[in-house]
């Protein structure tokens, strides 16, 4: 009986984009679109969802909380600075405790790559809100929804992911699923920050990226994950690898700019472009609520 509950929880949770087929992804996007259009779903009974954030977060944390409250869920907020993990309690024991006191799902962001492998014995769904440099599936889904709203289809689109790819869970979640959905993915940025991506994807210059991309997906320089923060000055990075006003002028009329945020203005993107006509950065944030409502419904229905 317990093994069946664990298997069901695994199926309803969401830890990586790779665990979902294309049809599942499209179904989730369809559900998200319905929520964005005003659809209502409520659980039949009182359900508690615990949000465990072990890393700083604004967009993801509050987006999940808004999604949970719109669905009529009871939200348990976890403060990692004042929790028993500070006394040495393991992530598993913390999660197991929340499961035992009645949490129906756990939303977790953790600095450790693939932390969720340690939680396979739980019988409640785990929703990954970001693991180290590994995965960020709900960010990927909201990015996909934003692209779908713009172009209706993914087939034939050229998406360039640019910036600090080696340290980006967003890049890892997006590159493969975009390819599976029919898009062509290229990468841009310092070759030192490409990690494994140049093994699979074509590396282009930033000027080429601006000219060629239907979707130019800029990534934050993750200074906190670099051993050497002084590899580039902010000004040098912006001129060599950022989206400057001059590069934006090279972009095709229909092309859009995306960024998972937070944005380092005048580093990845010129400040004047953050809210320009082709920017979809705040649309991405707005779409996060509908996407996370869809993911929570899938986990709890």
Curated annotation (Swiss-Prot):
Positions bound to carbamoyl phosphate: 59-60, 109, 136, 139, 261-262
Q: Which UniProt keywords apply?
A: Pyrimidine biosynthesis, Transferase
| Residues that coordinate or bind L-aspartate | 87, 169, 220
UniProt-listed NCBIfam families:
asp_carb_tr, PRK00856.1
Function as written in the Swiss-Prot or TrEMBL entry: Catalyzes the condensation of carbamoyl phosphate and aspartate to form carbamoyl aspartate and inorganic phosphate, the committed step in the de novo pyrimidine nucleotide biosynthesis pathway.
The similarity comment for this entry is:
Belongs to the aspartate/ornithine carbamoyltransferase superfamily. ATCase family.
Q: What is this protein called?
A: Aspartate carbamoyltransferase catalytic subunit
């Amino acid at each position: 009986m317990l093994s069946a509950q664990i298997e069901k929880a695994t199926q309803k949770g969401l830890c990586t984009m790779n665990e979902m087929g294309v049809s599942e992804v499209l179904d989730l996007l369809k559900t998200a679109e319905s929520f964005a259009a005003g659809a209502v779903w409520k659980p039949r009974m009182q359900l508690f969802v615990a949000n465990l954030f072990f890393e700083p977060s604004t967009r993801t944390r509050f987006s999940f909380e808004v999604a949970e409250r719109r669905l009529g869920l009871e939200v348990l907020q976890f403060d990692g600075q004042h929790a028993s993990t500070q006394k040495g309690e393991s992530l598993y024991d913390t999660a197991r405790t929340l499961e035992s006191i009645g949490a129906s799902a756990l939303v977790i962001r953790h600095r450790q790559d693939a932390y969720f492998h340690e939680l396979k014995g739980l019988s409640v769904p785990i929703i990954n809100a970001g693991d180290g440099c590994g995965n960020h599936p709900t960010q990927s889904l909201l990015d996909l929804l934003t692209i779908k709203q713009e172009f209706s289809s993914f087939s034939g689109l050229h998406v360039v992911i640019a910036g600090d790819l080696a340290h980006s869970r967003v890049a890892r979640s997006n590159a493969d699923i975009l390819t599976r959905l029919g898009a062509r993915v290229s990468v841009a940025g310092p070759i030192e920050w490409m990690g494994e991506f140049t093994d699979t994807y074509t590396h282009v210059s930033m000027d080429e990226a601006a000219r060629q991309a239907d979707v130019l997906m800029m990534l934050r320089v993750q200074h906190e994950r670099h051993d050497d923060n002084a590899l580039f000055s902010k000004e040098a990075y912006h001129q060599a690898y950022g989206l400057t006003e001059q590069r934006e002028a090279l972009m095709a009329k229909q092309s859009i700019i995306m960024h998972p945020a937070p944005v380092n203005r005048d580093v990845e993107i010129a400040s004047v472009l953050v809210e320009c006509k082709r920017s979809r950065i705040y649309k991405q944030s707005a779409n996060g609520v509908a996407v996370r409502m869809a993911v929570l419904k899938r986990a709890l229905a």
